[in-house]
């Protein structure tokens, strides 16, 4: 039975003029003429995109003028998961699309703006970028890199990272990167799985006004990769190349125009990694063609990004959003790379950057929005942010108060596009569209080509009810395989074990009768109290709306063997009256959520443990407090702060042993 849906406040609705000039409107007309279908609105287009997969994805390829070298024989012989074979026979090259001159602005317009934390800027036009990529391509060739070989990189969000990736892709080789703030064991766990040919590595990085040398990390990585044919030193801190490494300048010493090696549609483009909460991180391989099509579709149609636009997303090279940001080149936009701390010297840093470079699409994480909100920032009163047309938020669900803050303090005529997807598919499967309204606290729509549904435990499709987020039809950017997973069992176990032939994403979702969505948290971190299920995201929206709460984590220690307790861990703001705030939290949770969800224990902690990708470590904490050994519940190398995790567990155990009751 379906639940009820009461529409929340509409925060933004596109004007008729804005909707008319959106690329998605032109694409809809293109599809209507091509198919003879009537497509009166977004939902009709979405239905077409998920019901006629060959028709939709061939339309995407033709609309964007994909540069085929070998023509595909068909689009999708069989719509099966896993194992969908997209565009068999088709060959292409990612870098050729990223470096194309089609419809780009004036030749002197920057293709890339790279900004360091200290304000140093580097602007590259498309011809300049092509020249650098050509030089790096020649250098990689000299080191023996060819199609299918792996190039790995320990790099910040910099020009060298971009050039290294595009040069790798131009050769038909496979890219994989980690941020230099990763510890050596984390990097080694990732890179050793894919047996790279070449390593690119910086000597250090700058963050929060400080310099961090990583020479020792690089030495350990090189020792762990005995099959390297070459290692390249990038002097971010100005040091000389150590023995056995060549300098970046030497790699790129010979100028050349890049050449593009065509590879099959399903050939690997890059390897991304799961957070690796337990065991080794999953080495997720996405295809050249799948990413080209998906990012063209997402960035041009959903984000309305194109020539003349400037695209900034705060990210590191260890998060899939870096790969997504680079995709801005595919649609002719200028990409803005920021390397540093978003809080140095203060939280206005990125907003000043957005003003200076007239950013059109500004993306961030939901925790960054919360930090700006709690700091009382009012960016639109201090800066001219009128160039921004859309704000993107991902990483975790954007709270209702976060929506309100963006609307009130950044711009009332802004599309607020909270979106969710993940590393597994390197895109959003639910998000926004320039012709769809923004409702307070909700994700506006399901993405084109993403047949997202909400499933009951028995596989019944739900509406206006919370269920398991599943994808019931293949998408081109789904993994073609996990590296080293010879029989495909690890991939099948990761996504298809619960509903055969259906992708289980691992989140709770509610899809409304309007077509909007609400992500309710991870389905393996559900709060189940007296039979009433609740996602953790809903819990955090309430708890973290309290000004005295800096951060929080909630776990339900119940299991199949019996009821457990509901534990709320809180990082209180300095000077907070812990006893009074705890009492207020209990009252707020009782009235805003339910009496069943009032925590049995409220425990002050110094910090909430997070993964390297910034996600709260709910499941490992739940497992450990349920009795699992720490070493089997979490990979320490997956944690952003292993020592902080130890301090968190110590505080939790001491409070529980003392019978702490708030």
Language-model segments: residues:
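Adenylate-forming
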Residues: 156, 198-217, 238, 316, ...
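Conserved C-terminal "lid"/linker of ANL adenylate-forming enzymes
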Residues: 230, 553-559, 567-568, 586-662
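Conserved AMP-binding/adenylate-forming
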Residues: 301, 355, 389-516, 522-526, ...
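Conserved pre-ATP/AMP-binding loop-to-beta segment of ANL
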Residues: 108-110, 231-233, 244-273, 280, ...
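AMP-binding/adenylate-forming catalytic core of the ANL superfamily
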Residues: 153, 178-203, 355, 362, ...
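Conserved AMP-binding/adenylation subdomain of ANL enzymes
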Residues: 292-310, 320-360, 375-377
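Structural core segment of the AMP-binding/adenylate-forming
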Residues: 170-250, 357, 365-366
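Conserved AMP-binding/adenylate-forming core of the ANL superfamily
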Residues: 44-48, 95, 112-166, 183-188, ...
């Amino acid at each position: 039975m379906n639940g009820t849906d009461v529409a929340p406040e509409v925060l933004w609705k596109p004007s008729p003029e804005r909707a008319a000039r959106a690329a998605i409107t032109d694409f809809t007309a293109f599809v209507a003429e091509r198919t003879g279908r009537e497509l009166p609105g977004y939902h009709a287009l979405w239905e077409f995109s998920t019901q006629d997969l060959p028709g939709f994805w061939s339309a995407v390829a033709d609309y964007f003028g994909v540069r085929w070298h070998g023509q595909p024989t068909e689009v999708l012989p069989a719509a099966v998961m896993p194992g969908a074979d997209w565009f068999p026979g088709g060959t292409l090259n990612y870098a050729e699309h990223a470096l194309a001159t089609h419809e780009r602005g004036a030749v002197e317009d920057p293709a890339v703006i790279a900004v360091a934390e200290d304000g140093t800027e580097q602007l590259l036009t498309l011809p300049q970028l092509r020249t650098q990529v050509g030089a790096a391509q020649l250098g990689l060739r000299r080191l023996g890199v060819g199609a299918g070989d792996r190039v790995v990189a320990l790099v910040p969000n910099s020009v060298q990272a971009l050039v290294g990736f595009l040069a790798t892709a131009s050769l038909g080789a496979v890219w994989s990167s980690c941020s230099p703030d990763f510890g050596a064991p984390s990097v080694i766990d990732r890179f050793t799985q894919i047996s790279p040919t070449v390593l690119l590595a910086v000597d250090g990085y700058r963050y929060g006004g400080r310099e961090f040398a990583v020479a020792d990390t690089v030495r350990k990585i090189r020792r762990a990769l005995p099959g390297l044919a070459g290692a390249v030193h990038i002097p971010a801190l100005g040091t000389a190349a150590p023995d056995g490494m060549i300098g970046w300048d030497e790699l790129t010493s010979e100028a050349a125009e890049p050449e593009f090696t065509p590879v099959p549609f399903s050939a690997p483009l890059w390897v991304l990694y799961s957070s690796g909460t337990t065991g080794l991180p999953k080495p997720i391989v996405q295809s050249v063609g799948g990413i080209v099509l998906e990012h063209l579709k997402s960035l041009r149609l959903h984000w309305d990004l194109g020539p003349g636009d400037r695209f900034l997303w705060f990210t590191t090279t260890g998060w899939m959003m870096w790969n997504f940001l680079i995709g801005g080149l595919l649609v002719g936009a200028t990409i803005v790379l920021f390397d540093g701390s978003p809080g140095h010297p203060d939280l206005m840093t990125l907003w000043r950057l957005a003003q200076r470079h007239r950013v059109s699409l500004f993306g961030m994480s939901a925790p960054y929005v919360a930090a700006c909100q709690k700091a009382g920032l009012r960016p639109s009163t201090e800066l001219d942010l009128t160039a921004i047309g859309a704000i993107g938020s991902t990483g975790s669900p954007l709270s209702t108060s976060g929506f309100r803050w963006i609307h009130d303090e950044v711009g009332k005529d802004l599309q607020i596009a909270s979106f969710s997807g993940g590393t597994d598919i390197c895109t959003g499967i639910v998000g926004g569209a320039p012709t769809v309204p923004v409702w307070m606290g909700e994700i506006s729509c399901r993405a084109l080509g993403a047949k997202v549904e909400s499933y009951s435990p028995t596989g019944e499709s739900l509406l206006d009810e919370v269920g398991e987020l599943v994808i019931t039809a293949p998408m081109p950017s789904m993994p073609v395989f996990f590296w080293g997973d010879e029989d495909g069992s690890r991939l099948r176990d990761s996504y298809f074990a619960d509903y055969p032939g259906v992708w289980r994403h691992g989140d709770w979702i509610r899809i409304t009768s309007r077509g909007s969505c609400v992500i309710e948290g991870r389905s393996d971190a559900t709060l189940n109290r007296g039979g009433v299920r609740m996602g953790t995201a809903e819990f955090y929206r309430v708890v973290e709306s309290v000004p005295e709460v800096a951060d929080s984590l909630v776990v339900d220690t119940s299991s199949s063997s019996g009821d457990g307790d509901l534990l709320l861990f809180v990082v209180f703001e300095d000077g907070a009256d812990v006893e009074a705030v705890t009492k207020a939290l209990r009252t707020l949770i009782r009235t805003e959520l339910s009496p069943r969800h009032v925590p049995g224990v409220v425990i002050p902690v110094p910090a909430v443990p997070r993964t390297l990708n910034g996600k709260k470590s709910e499941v490992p904490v739940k497992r450990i407090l349920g009795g699992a050994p720490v070493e089997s519940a979490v990979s320490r190398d997956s944690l952003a702060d292993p020592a902080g995790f130890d301090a968190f567990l110590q505080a939790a155990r001491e409070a529980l042993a003392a019978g702490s009751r708030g």
